[in-house]
From Swiss-Prot:
It comes from Mus musculus (Mouse). The gene is Hebp1. Belongs to the HEBP family. Keywords: Cytoplasm. InterPro entries: Reg_factor_effector_dom_sf, SOUL_haem-bd. The keyword Magnesium does not apply. Monomer. This is Heme-binding protein 1. It is found in: Cytoplasm. SUPFAM superfamilies: Probable bacterial effector-binding domain.
Length: 190
């Protein structure tokens, strides 16, 4: 676990592969259109809890799996970003449902260790194309909602189309990183 934290703080962390297809923006909001590679992901779903509380429940389970709480007892190392899906209601508020996605490192993609915790699932996920915007700080539910709204507004009047029933939030930094934090909101291209 200490090795994962050290790597997260000092830069030797595997990044989820993607390709920037285009960039754009309006006023103070910029975005990238990215093609993100698919693969195998460790997932945890939490329902009936607000986003921040659901993350506090799900993230330790993912971290334990990555850190070696699996059938092989092997620590896999981190990949970034860790992403999670949010499900908006028609009024913009969020459903009490969250799904965390952690892309399994490349060296374990062929045969990922089986989770010891039954709430952690391994899922094959197709590649996706997203519209992504970035922001800093310690992100909370209100920040993700605000940045998703800003990104939607920025995409108005462009040819961009995206799914309205889900969006992803992504974090690149361990909780103890005090500054230079990177968070993103992704709208999935329709």
């Amino acid at each position: 676990m200490l090795g994962m934290i050290r790597n997260s703080l000092f830069g030797s962390v595997e990044t989820w592969p993607w390709q920037v297809l285009s960039t754009g923006g309006k006023e103070d909001v910029s975005y990238e259109e990215r093609a993100c590679e698919g693969g195998k992901f460790a997932t945890v779903e939490v329902t009936d809890k607000p986003v921040d509380e659901a993350l506090r429940e799900a993230m330790p389970k993912i971290m334990k799996y990555v850190g070696g709480t699996n059938d092989k007892g092997v620590g896999m190392g981190m990949t970034v970003p860790v992403s999670f899906a949010l499900f908006p209601n028609e009024d913009g508020s969020l459903q009490k449902k969250l799904k965390v996605w952690f892309r399994i490192p490349n060296q374990f993609q062929g045969s990922p260790p089986a989770p010891s915790d039954e709430s952690v699932k391994i899922e094959e996920r197709e590649g996706i194309t997203v519209y992504s915007t970035q922001f800093g700080g310690y992100a909370k539910e209100a920040d993700y909602v605000a940045h998703a709204t800003q990104l939607r507004t920025t995409l108005e009047g462009t040819p961009a189309t995206y799914q309205g029933d889900v969006y992803y939030c992504a974090g690149y930094d361990p909780p103890m990183k005090p500054y230079g934090r990177r968070n993103e909101v992704w709208l999935v291209k329709a």
